[in-house]
Regions:
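N-terminal basic/disordered segments at the start of proteins
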Residues: 1-37
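Alpha/propeptide regions of enzymes that mature by internal proteolysis
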Residues: 1-3, 30-113, 177-216
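N-proximal short alpha-helices
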Residues: 7-17, 66, 154-158, 162
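Short Gly/Ser/Thr- and Asp/Glu-enriched loop/turn motifs at secondary-structure junctions
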Residues: 17-19, 113-116
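General secondary-structure edge motif
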Residues: 21, 77, 81, 162-165, ...
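Conserved mixed alpha/beta catalytic, RNA-binding, or beta-rich assembly cores of soluble enzyme
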Residues: 114-215
Length: 216
């Protein structure tokens, strides 16, 4: 399947290719930004696939690709002989697409949302509002992020996410300096939420639950 692009309501761009699904918004030179986003997106999956065996191994040897290096840097603080760079893949992809947009186009505000892991670009008076909800979709309020805040990445991980989690948390959300850093931290926190030896928790090897996992 080839990379797909479509425009959504609210002047948003939808990009998809295999497991990668992005929702993108931009204020400013939007058309130029969207063209840059798609041009960069076209090769993302192939780049990651080329180094996937290494990225699924515990953090160690430095990968070559630009996105893979973002993943490696974000995962490095958590290197323990088990953790892999895949803990930061969604955030790193979002961050890379946003970087391509801001390099090409003058933007006051932009975001790239990769399945809930979000890379942000904010300047001047621009803000980004994050809605907070409970697992049963009860509205718990909002958080406004401004350009003066040291936050450019938001990520959520847990049992309800797209990837397997080693923990039992419904969701853990992290705000950080970059999307890849937020993704890595949220993944690790989600993995750490556990009740050892609880009789209502069933444990099994990850590869018996999903055959494409890197969790073993």
């Amino acid at each position: 399947m080839m990379p797909q692009a479509s425009l959504l309501s609210g002047d948003r761009l939808h990009l998809s290719h295999g497991p990668i699904d992005l929702i993108i918004g931009a204020d400013g030179a939007r058309n130029a930004a969207f063209r840059a986003a798609f041009a960069r997106f076209e090769t993302v999956l192939d780049e990651l696939t080329a180094e996937l065996p290494l990225l699924r191994q515990p953090v160690g040897n430095r990968p070559k690709g630009k996105i893979a290096r973002r993943m490696y840097r974000a995962a490095l603080p958590y290197a323990d002989g088990v953790t892999t760079p895949m803990i930061a893949v969604a955030g790193a992809v979002a961050q890379e697409i946003l970087a391509a947009m801001t390099k090409t186009a003058e933007l006051t505000r932009a975001y790239v949302n990769n399945g809930g892991d979000i890379a942000l670009h904010l300047t001047g008076a621009a803000t980004f509002r994050v809605a907070i909800a409970s697992p049963d979709n009860q509205n718990l309020g909002t958080v406004d992020i401004s350009s003066t805040d040291a936050i450019r990445g938001i990520a959520t991980s847990g049992q309800r996410g797209r990837s397997l989690s080693l923990g039992i948390a419904d969701a853990v959300t992290v705000l950080a300096r970059s999307a890849s850093m937020a993704d890595a931290a949220a993944t690790q926190l989600g993995n750490a939420v556990d009740l050892h030896d609880h009789p209502h928790i069933t444990r099994a090897p990850a590869n018996t639950v999903r055959d494409d996992t890197d969790l073993g």
